[in-house]
Amino acid sequence: MDKIKPRIFIASSVEGLDAAYAIQELLEFSAECTVWDQDVFAPSSVTLLDLIKRAQNSDYGIFVFSFDDTIKIRDTEELTVRDNVVFELGLFIGIIGIANCFIVMPRSNDDIHLPTDLTGITPLKYNAKRADNNLKAALGPSANQIKRALRSFSPPDKQMSDELSQQINAIGLSAFFSSRDDYSKYRASTPSIDR
């Protein structure tokens, strides 16, 4: 019987795709990795709902922080990561837990701005300025650290996972209704998570 591999979602900006693909290749034999541009978002669908579904069906998330944007804070310009990648990290932390999310970013001496809420999370850093421009080799140490973390993976209990997903959906959807009455009407028209 083949060992079940963990499912990993890899997020990045368009500019960070080369690093995302390199990580996917480096983890090929350790996990089933899907980069965000590989059929994650269905045509005519709601991006946020696709991301929630992907998070619920992932065991881990890897978030490639490439510093593509600039931000001005108190008259100082700094490089910063694309905001949607930070949002996706937060979404995944909320659904699969902080221990199952990895930040991968280039080592840099430049003025880099990260949201203060991420202070204390240790990112995996790589040398993006290698003389030979070998991105896979640069990302190798980060990928090896992720592989070591994956050794503790055990497939989740499917029934428990499904029940938890349903509860998360019910809780999350309740925030979108303006009144308890609206939510009650919605709940009356959908299958109960308690049945």
Regions found by a protein language model. Give the residues of each.
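Conserved N-terminal substructure of TIR/SEFIR domains
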Residues: 1-61, 95, 178-195
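Residue-level detector of alpha-helical recognition elements and their boundaries
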Residues: 25, 107-108, 161
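Short, surface-exposed, charged/polar-biased interaction segments
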Residues: 29-31, 44, 48, 72, ...
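Cross-kingdom TIR/SEFIR domain
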Residues: 53-57, 61-149
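C-terminal interaction surface of TIR/SEFIR-family domains
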Residues: 112-193
